[in-house]
């Protein structure tokens, strides 16, 4: 078998265009599958990360030898994180569960400021901040819409972030890992030729 040249090994995934979320966990061991996304998430530029930590090495030494007699390792943790700058009700339900989200049909302020004390009041959504595991599959679509990165068996948690109040909107940081030990959980795909 001939050595593979650099040009033959070029197979990049770069430039995410959008991130889709599906509640269903995809079985990446199958040759064909269908995924129906539930949400197209508005992700803050440069907040998307999918990384794996360095492995932990275990060195076994014996008397009289300077080097390792044997070496073993444990895989590093895989983590996924991204920031979604939206408080849309459908997103809140996906992040915290339907029972944590409620409608406020009218809130009336009595401040003496006629702009704030509108007789029509304010309407909106109430949220109970609680621990809720977001499970399923994310699909990252590249800028050309011809390549995908699929990460399934995800377990994510959302936390509210609003620390740059003058320049950034209220946002939620999704962070977590893959719970797919022993399962194929990441795939890179390219659009098939017609």
Would you name each region that the model predicts?
Residues 1-43, 194:
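Polar/acidic, low-complexity leader/linker segments enriched in S/T/G and N/D
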Residues 2-7, 85-126:
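Charged, amphipathic alpha-helical segments
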Residues 41-58:
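N-terminal beta-strand/beta-hairpin edge segment
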Residues 46, 56, 74-80, 132-136:
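A generic structural signal for short beta-strands and their flanking turns/coil linkers
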Residues 55-68:
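Short acidic (Asp/Glu) patches
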Residues 67-92, 167-183:
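Oligomerization/assembly interface segments of phage tail-like spikes and tubes
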Residues 121-145:
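Phosphate/anion-contacting hairpin/loop surfaces
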Residues 145-194:
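Mixed-charge, glycine-accented linear interaction segment located at domain edges/termini
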């Amino acid at each position: 078998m001939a050595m593979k040249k650099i040009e033959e090994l070029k197979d990049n995934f770069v430039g995410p265009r959008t991130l889709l979320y599906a509640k269903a966990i995809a079985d990446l061991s199958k040759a064909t599958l269908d995924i129906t996304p539930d949400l197209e998430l508005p992700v803050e530029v440069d907040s998307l990360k999918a990384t794996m930590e360095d492995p932990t090495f275990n060195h076994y030494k014996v008397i009289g030898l300077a080097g390792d007699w044997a070496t073993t390792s444990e895989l590093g943790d895989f983590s996924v994180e991204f920031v979604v700058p939206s408080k849309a009700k459908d997103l809140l339900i996906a992040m915290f569960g339907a029972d944590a989200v409620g409608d406020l049909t009218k809130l009336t302020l009595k401040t003496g400021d006629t702009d704030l004390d509108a007789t029509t009041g304010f309407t909106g959504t109430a949220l109970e901040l609680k621990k809720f595991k977001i499970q399923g599959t994310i699909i990252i679509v590249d800028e050309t819409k011809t390549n995908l990165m699929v990460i399934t068996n995800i377990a994510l948690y959302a936390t509210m972030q609003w620390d740059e109040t003058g320049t950034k909107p209220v946002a939620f940081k999704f962070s977590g890992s893959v719970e797919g030990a022993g399962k194929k959980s990441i795939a890179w795909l390219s659009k098939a030729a017609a």
